[in-house]
């Protein structure tokens, strides 16, 4: 595809989604397109405004907020969408690539499409609000129904609706031929290598390797040589949607059968609550805070056997960023995320799918897996899936096949 002479505007109101926006925009630039990024001057994680400047970027003066779920945050998103719409009217781009949420951006995109019908409109849905907040009763409340419709009622305006996972497509009203899935890619870390077992079996077979002994794992036992300890990693924000009670309950049950230790890489408003609940059940843990250096993260993960990927029941998520890190570093999953992740765990046999009504059975399954001698093979399988599904190259292939062709051919 030759993008020479084409103008693309990439819009996101969330600093958390900027890596996706920057990556997509750079792909367009590589094709010769002129790219403008419209982003925010408010840093979501830190809850502060910053003076920002970069070539080919416009930073919208964004209304600050303190709470993630608040009327002020919704107003901030509405105000951002209104200002972004004015910028788009002036730019007259060949393509507008909008990252959702905010849901109010979908409404703005619809209005832009009506005014400039020759513009290609792409929505890239990275989260579902309010569905990802969980709670069936909550979803039925009138304000939340309006919030959801702010997105759903305007999806039909898009020439293409991208979702971050297949699971999201069950909840949106978009024609299948106008949808695509682009997983959030993770760049292959510097120095990364696959852990290939010596007697790797064909991919359609489940190999049985020699069991790892306690002495072989002595370096990951955090000072404990006997009995052996099963080390778990939890990576990511410690917020109101992670299943703290489920994680603690599972570790408590498992801990009655064998010693356990939890490594927590992340931070958030519920860190104190998480620490208290672990301590109350006698579960040993270490909190490292937010870690962004891949080498540090890799070193922590090298001490762990499993990665915990659990959110509260009802939260509408099919794939998490933490799970992609687990795939990258080959940590078998303790998972309760439905959709894409649940099916991968089930079909590829790369961990256990946790069910709260069968917590004891799940703990027994995990212990059997830990003692099966299959961990090395599962690590290799997970890293193979990472290379196939979650690298930048894998995501770029979809962008080339679906998005670049739209830019070249115009609206459908």
Predicted regions and their residues:
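Conserved donor-binding/catalytic core segment of Leloir-type glycosyltransferases
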Residues: 200-210, 219-242, 247-252, 263, ...
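A short, active-site helix/loop in glycosyltransferases that binds the activated sugar's phosphate group
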Residues: 148-181, 188-193, 343
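N-terminal subdomain of nucleotide-sugar transferases
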Residues: 1-55, 160, 249-258
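Membrane-proximal helix-turn-helix segments that form the acceptor-binding/catalytic region
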Residues: 104-107, 111-116, 142-161
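A charged, aromatic-enriched C-terminal amphipathic alpha-helix characteristic of glycosyltransferases
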Residues: 357-362, 370-405
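Nucleotide-sugar donor phosphate/pyrophosphate-binding loop at the beta->alpha transition
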Residues: 119-120, 131-153, 190
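Nucleotide-activated donor-binding/catalytic signature segment of Leloir-type glycosyltransferases, i.e.
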Residues: 263, 272-298
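Nucleotide-sugar-dependent
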Residues: 19, 242, 288, 293-300, ...
């Amino acid at each position: 595809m030759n993008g020479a002479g084409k103008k693309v505007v990439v819009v996101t109101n969330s600093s958390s989604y900027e890596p996706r926006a920057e990556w997509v925009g750079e792909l367009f630039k590589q094709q010769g397109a002129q790219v403008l990024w419209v982003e925010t001057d408010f840093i979501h994680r830190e809850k502060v405004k910053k003076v920002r400047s970069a070539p080919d970027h416009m930073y919208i003066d964004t209304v600050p907020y303190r709470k993630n779920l608040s009327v002020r945050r919704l107003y901030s998103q509405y105000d951002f969408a209104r200002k972004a719409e004015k910028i788009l009217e002036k730019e007259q781009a060949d393509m507008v690539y909008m990252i959702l949420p905010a849901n109010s951006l979908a409404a703005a995109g619809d209005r832009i499409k009506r005014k400039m019908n020759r513009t290609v409109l792409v929505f890239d849905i990275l989260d579902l609000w309010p569905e990802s907040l969980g709670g069936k009763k909550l979803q039925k409340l009138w304000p939340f129904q309006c919030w959801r419709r702010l997105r759903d009622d305007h999806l039909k305006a898009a020439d293409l609706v991208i979702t971050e996972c297949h699971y999201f497509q069950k909840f949106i009203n978009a024609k299948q031929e106008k949808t695509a899935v682009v997983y959030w890619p993770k760049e292959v870390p510097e120095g990364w290598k696959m852990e290939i077992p010596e007697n790797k079996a064909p991919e359609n077979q489940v190999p049985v390797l020699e069991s790892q002994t306690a002495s072989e794992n002595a370096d990951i036992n955090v000072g404990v040589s006997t009995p052996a300890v099963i080390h778990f990693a939890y990576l990511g924000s410690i917020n109101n949607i992670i299943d703290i009670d489920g994680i603690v309950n599972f570790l408590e049950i498992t801990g009655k059968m064998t010693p356990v230790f939890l490594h927590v890489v992340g931070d958030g408003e519920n860190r104190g609550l998480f620490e208290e609940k672990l301590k109350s059940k006698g579960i040993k843990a270490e909190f490292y805070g937010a870690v962004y250096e891949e080498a540090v993260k890799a070193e922590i993960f090298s001490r762990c056997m499993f990665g915990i990927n659990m959110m509260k029941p009802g939260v509408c998520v099919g794939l998490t960023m933490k799970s992609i890190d687990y795939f990258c570093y080959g940590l078998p999953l303790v998972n309760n995320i439905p959709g894409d992740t649940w099916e991968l765990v089930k079909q590829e046999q790369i961990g256990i799918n946790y069910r709260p009504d069968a917590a004891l059975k799940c703990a027994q399954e995990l212990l059997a897996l830990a003692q099966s001698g299959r961990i090395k093979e599962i690590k290799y399988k997970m890293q193979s899936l990472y290379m196939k599904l979650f690298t930048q190259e894998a995501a770029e292939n979809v962008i080339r096949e679906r998005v670049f062709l739209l830019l070249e051919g115009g609206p459908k």
